[in-house]
Amino acid sequence: MKSCSIILILSVLFLCGCSSYPVPPEMVAKYAENIVVDGIHNEKGWSETPEYQLTTARSRMKELHPDLREKYGRNPASPGTVRLLFDRQYLYVGAVLTDDDIISLGTRDQQVHCGEGDVFEIFLKPENANYYWELHITPAGYCAVIFYPSRGYHFLSKIVMPEVRPLKKIKYKSVISGTLNRSGDFDRLWSLEAAIPLDELAAKGIPFDSDHPWRILIGRYNYSCHQKICELSSFPQLNRFNFHAHEEYGTIRLVRAKSKIRP
């Protein structure tokens, strides 16, 4: 009987030790009013909501050539941060992205911008539904929105990039500190704000509120002539770089003004 107990304990420890997928963290969105979508983050609410650092995937140290691991395997060479706010109408996403070569070759909205230069991506998914949203925002000020009925529709041509943007009331603004599409100099950063309409999210069936859990992933493509690779980063940290890995998305926790944020 004692030996069986030991075997059971060892089996549990083995299974726990083999798991490479930790529980995704939550992202707190604090309630704030009078947010102006200008890409600057100068309202008080932005300084009062938690800041999250974009990271490389856990697998990068193994996947990269040894010559690249030290610079690109542990932390992004070009760091980025993201914060969340909300009010009665919108979920606000704000980001500050260090960037030594700001490039954005896309020429319109509703374009697959991750193949056209630097892009900031937002993925939103209800916990208890298959559908989800993908949003692209570029330093040049373009935006693309994709609605997926399911991850099983991911590569269907009519789903990949619809001509008409599904979120008609979305607001966004990018601000750059540097020069756009000029590779001969060194840029500093670009920042952005996006306001995602809650009623249009809810129109697909599930409200965006505290009674209905939603999940989120932030992704970034960073191209640079000064770096040796195109650098991808995200929050939460992914096991491997797959921005459609819903199981690794973080959970959103909406916090009213007087609520305390758990450390």
Describe the residue ranges of each PLM region.
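Positively charged n-region of N-terminal signal peptides that target proteins for export
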Residues: 1-5
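Bacterial N-terminal signal peptides
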Residues: 7-16
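Structural preference for beta-rich elements and adjacent junctions enriched in aromatics
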Residues: 18-263
